[in-house]
Amino acid sequence: MWWPIGPYGTIMAFILASTIPLRNLLTRDEPEERLRLSDLPQEIRSKGYKWHISLYLAMYLFKAVIDHHNEPLKSRVGGYTHWVHQLEGDFTLWAQEAFRNDLLTEALAFHYLFVYLFIIWFVPIYFILVKDHVMADKAALNYLVVYVLAVPLYLFFNVEVTSSFIPGMDALLYHDSWYIEFITNNDPLDNGIPSLHFGLPLGLLIINRLHCREMGIPLKEWRHRELDLFIIINLGIYLFSIQYLGIHWITDTIPGIILAFICAYFCHHWQPLLRDRPTKGWRSIMPSSRGIALAVAFSVACTSAIALVAIDGPGSEEDVANFRLGPGDLVIDTIEVHSLNHPVTVEIRNVGEFGSLCVILERTHVVSDFEKGRFSNGFDFNDLLEYPYHQVVPLISGESWRGEVETPSILDTSLVICHSSGGISELRISMEYVDDELIFTGILASLPAFIITGLVVDVASRSEGVEGEDSADVDA
């Protein structure tokens, strides 16, 4: 499918066009609470919303830094998809096969990208546009904190998408002509754990409940109850779509749930402290000595686990497959552009019993040849060999190939596309980049997650202690 502004531009246009109408729909019973657009600049200045804008810009840069680390670290970290597969098997394949329908695929693919970006953008904007600065703060913090918490798992516990590892499962979203360029530019396809498509909206739901409990308001009487229902409905859709589209394992949602709780407690506790900081000073947001001790303890313990277990650990064993494909299946791995002058060293090892054929070629040649996880009608793997290519790699069981691929342009990249004509092929595809020694900075980027976790443990334990004392007083 061709469209001049692509999926991201289309989705952002939808988001911008629907923001005010949806705000008006959700506040139809209280129009007096709406902020006039002409008053928005003054509201931004008076409520200090400039830091929200700065936060989103910082988040964009931080994500770019993490993405820059992801692939180079894999040569030392490897992946753990085989562990997840051993745990839950091929259950998600059933979800795809039982409900597969072209119209459903189109709807869920658009929903997967649209609603996630919509929740990131709309929820804090909605709270700003209905003059609720407390919830606007918490929603903006939720986006930043939940991603920060996910960084250690993204960098040091790689899990491939289900469609790359379950034979017979198609990448209904990722291997499609309209999405493939956007996806290969923005998603390494091995950040299965945790699922932030599940964790981010769940964090908002938990924040909503903590807020209502603090205010003494029943959730059903909260003025933003309809927004809460909107998020709940979309969370339910995500639970199905991430399996149906060949993206997430069910297991991926569990760390997402855990991070959502940690994130929600952090945002709920620190929002008023951050909001009052200009008047009370920096000392007002400093954690207790116990909180600092727990943050340091978590940082030391988790950093040690990364250094001693994750790096050159069980995920990096050369005989462990990170791609599995059945007869007629195809898998795609992206060769990222990290340097215009230094080639990427690519190694493909056949660690299974059946042979496989791989071709390495530039994405621009094949972007229109995929449709809903498969080749377009009338096109097959052999047609790829008609394009200019870097290398064709036929591999029988036990064979490996190692070579260099140039990345001369930031406007295009190369893809490793592999195919199995018979039997279940198991491959290990690894790449070495010029900046592959990023272990130290990767660990540094993970430290905020460990610090936040330690601080939340301190706050949560103190809250439980206070509630216990209150209950004892009531009983007495």
Kindly label every feature range from the protein language model:
Residues N191, I247-H248:
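Alpha-helix N-cap/helix-initiation motif
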Residues I193, E353-S356:
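Extracellular acidic loop/turn motifs
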Residues V161-P167:
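Juxtamembrane/interfacial segments flanking transmembrane helices
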Residues D187-L210:
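Alpha-helical transmembrane segments of helical membrane proteins, especially in multi-pass transport
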Residues M1-V159, D170, H175-F182, C212-Y244, ...:
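Terminal transmembrane helix and immediately flanking juxtamembrane interfaces
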